[in-house]
Amino acid sequence: MAPGFPLAELAQSVGAAAARTVEEAQFKEDALPGGREVKAFAAAWPERIAETALRDGEWMLRIDEDWFAWANGRLLPDSERSRWEDYAALPLYRYPLSLPPLAVLDEEAAARLRQRVRDDAANPPRRHEGFLGRLLQAGSRAETEGRVVRMEVAGFTVTVHERLEQPLTRVSEELRALRLTDPAVAGFLKGLTEINGYNYRFVEGTHSRSFHSYGLAVDLVPKSYGGRHAYWMWAMSKVRDFWTVPYERRWMVPAPVVEVFERNGFVWGGKWLFFDTMHFEYRPEILFMARE
């Protein structure tokens, strides 16, 4: 060491270098695909996801004793991650916390979207069900039906996955209070005929299990749609391009009701391009990313 070199400055210099090394390592980790999403799952489901790790350049998470790889959004068992092209990605996206403007597509983009709809109808996408099945302990119909519960939500009896019991209890309590102070909400709830939950079925037109088949989704079904569109696929029988249907012509859930569900971990299908305005899906990992 040079005579008179201050030890404090040396320590500060070494500390700064170490901090830069940590920051650079963190940057590299965050830059790898899937890091944000894997961490969101771990934050949203701490009772099921034991740990996350970088292994062989891939973000992974562990449920019980099994590791699942990000695998370009497919979330595959470690032994199958090289086959990611055989499967569709699990829906993970930037969810808007306010009602987004309608999509405005030029003719080229519109043509691509029309072709995508045709392609999906001809060759339905198929997700690997292993991750959600293990996460929810609902890999088969029999296993799923051992995990569902019947409960009351806003005056209706609904069957859902047991993980939804607490958040839906809070939803019901908040809606009960809201209907006393908000006439629009009271009228909306009075206009419902049922709330549907668990239903072991596949997404319409695909080979993938619906989130209803895990008991993770509920549909608020009205007595009448009043001539409005609630679902993009139904709208296609009336309009050429479903995404152009203005909000005024869609059956809509009042914003205060949507906010109650969102506060408790649910995303609303009314904010999707492929809209489903009656549909709420328990996706706390998506809301975690939206609020980062």
Where are these regions (language model features)?
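Catalytic cores and adjacent binding grooves of peptidoglycan-active enzymes
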Residues: 20-25, 29-30, 34-45, 57-72, ...
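Gram-negative bacterial Sec-dependent N-terminal signal peptides
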Residues: 1-3, 9-12
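Active-site acidic/histidine clusters and adjacent loop/turn architecture
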Residues: 119-190
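Acidic, glycine-rich low-complexity/disordered segments
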Residues: 185-201
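Generic hydrophobic secondary-structure signal
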Residues: 80-94, 98-105, 171, 175, ...
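N-terminal accessory beta-strand-rich subdomains and adjacent acidic, glycine-rich linkers
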Residues: 10, 14-141, 145
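General secondary-structure edge motif
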Residues: 112, 151, 155, 200, ...
